[in-house]
Every structure is written in C-alpha cells, then in structure tokens.
UniProtKB/Swiss-Prot annotation:
Pfam families: adh_short (PF00106). It comes from Bacillus subtilis (strain 168). Gene3D superfamilies: NAD(P)-binding Rossmann-like Domain. Its EC number is 1.-.-.-. It comes from the Bacteria. InterPro entries: 3-OHbutyrate_DH, NAD(P)-bd_dom_sf, Sc_DH/Rdtase_CS, SDR, SDR_fam. NCBIfam families: PHB_DH, PRK12429.1. NAD(+) binds at D34, D60, V61, N87, Y152, K156. This is Uncharacterized oxidoreductase YxjF. Transmembrane segments: none annotated. The keyword NAD applies.
Length: 257
C-alpha cells in the first residue's frame, strides 16, 4: 500500500477514521473526507501528528459536483487514486408507517446514491491506472431485515448490489469492488444508541448490552473498529486481488443463526 492514495468518506470518526489510520500506517497517503469541516480537519491533523501522510477534504458526498471537484483535486495533487472507501452514513429508526418520506430519501441518498456517484467518478481514473480498490461499507442489515430500519436496510441491500455490478465492470481493468458488512461495532454512534435505550428502559448501560445486543451476537461482544479497519486493509492489499464482488461479513456470528 506504500505510495498509494486512498480516499475515505465519513472519516472524521468511528470506522472511517480507523480505516484511514490503518491505511496510513501501511504507507498510503490518505484523504480524510467528512461533511463536517472542523471534524474533518481535526481527524487529518491527528493522523499527521502521528506521523502519517494525511489531508482533509470536507465535502457533501451527495452533491455530484463536489464529488467531481474532490476527485479532480486528488488527481491533480497526487496524480492517482488507488483506493476508495465509501463509509459515510446516517441512521434513523421508526416503523414504516411513521417513517418520514424525506428522511427515507435522504438516507438512501447518503448510503446508496453517494457510493454510486463516487464510483462513477473514480472509475475512469482507476481504469486508466488499470488498478483500483473500492470498499463499500455495508452492514449485516444489507443481508437480513431489522424492524424499524426500512431506509437503512434498503440502502445497505442496495449497496451490496452496486458492489457486485462494480466488481463485474471493474474486473477487466484491475479494479476490485467489495462490501464490508459489520455487525454491532463499538463506535460512538452505537454507544449513543445504547445509552438512549438504557435511559428509555431505565436500566444500566451494561444491562442493555446483556439484554438486547448479546442475545443476537454469539460471541457476546461488540466488534472493535480496528477489526473492521484491518479487514479493509486486507481487501485493499495485493493479497486480496482475487476477492471481488463479495459481501464480507464481520459480525461475531450474528448472521450464522
């Protein structure tokens, strides 16, 4: 991965930041992207302070003109773009009959349309290079249903389909496209959701883990962001050149049941 250039969206924190860090640790030049400029700059600065080659480019992944501009800037500055990680995501939970249509459409836009737009604009560069690694962060919710997550599940199922099409179109040009499907991961977003649930149920945080999450996960634990990042590194590596069009599951056994 040394001397390669990687763009990671939604990289100001959580899984995205850890993926950016692990890519940088492997020697890649990393472009940290996020909708929030200050958080984006802070994340890139943190990586730079750790001695890594990192730059911040904040932009809205749903705005095609901004995506095109970002890809052009990267191409001009680095002369190449080897790795794309589509990680940006948002969440909303509600029964179908109570789910606001505009919220549903926004989730689809961020987590399905945005990866399509990004792939659309990096494919020409990767085809010209005859090399590319695209990793779409999907979810176990892209493989199974989950009540209350109609938009999230629809987007994640869709991005797995997009991944397969991208893999077929990219294969003749040295481009691999895969989807990572994490289960429950120890991120701030998940911790906030569990904290809200503990308040709603008036039970301790650990009780929420024991009563709600662990019955679903045979390993009885949350995955770490580094576990997800390590697998992203593998998929971007030469060792995984034969892996493409796959929905790779890391879920502590959740979908084995």
């Amino acid at each position: 991965m040394r001397k390669q250039v990687a763009l990671v969206t939604g990289a100001a924190g959580g899984i995205g930041f850890e993926i950016a860090r692990e890519f940088a640790r492997e020697g890649a030049s990393v472009i940290v992207s996020d909708l929030r400029p200050e958080a984006c700059e802070k994340a890139a600065s943190k990586l730079a302070e750790e001695g890594f080659d990192a730059a911040a480019i904040p932009y809205d992944v749903t705005k095609e003109a901004q995506v095109a501009d970002t890809v052009n800037v990267i191409q001009k500055q680095y002369g190449r773009l080897d790795i794309l990680v589509n990680n940006a995501g948002i969440q909303h939970v509600a029964p179908i009959e109570e789910f606001p249509t505009d919220t549903f459409e926004q989730l689809i836009k961020v987590m399905l349309t945005a990866p399509f737009i990004a792939m659309k604009h990096v494919f020409p560069i990767m085809k010209k290079q005859q090399f590319g690694r695209i990793i779409n962060i999907a979810s176990v919710n892209g493989l199974v249903g989950f009540a209350g997550k109609s938009a999230y599940n629809s987007a994640k199922h869709g991005v797995i389909g997009l991944t397969k099409v991208g893999a077929l179109e990219g294969a003749p040009h040295g481009i691999t496209v895969n989807a990572l499907c994490p289960g429950y991961v120890d991120t701030q977003l998940v911790r906030n959701q569990l904290s809200d649930l503990s308040k709603t149920r008036n039970v301790p945080y650990d009780s929420v883990l024991e009563q709600v999450i662990f019955p679903l996960v045979p390993q009885k634990r949350l995955l770490s962001v580094k576990e997800i990042a390590d697998y992203a590194v593998f998929l971007a590596s030469e060792k995984a050149k034969g892996v493409t069009g796959q929905a790779v599951v890391l879920d502590g056994g959740y979908t084995a049941q």
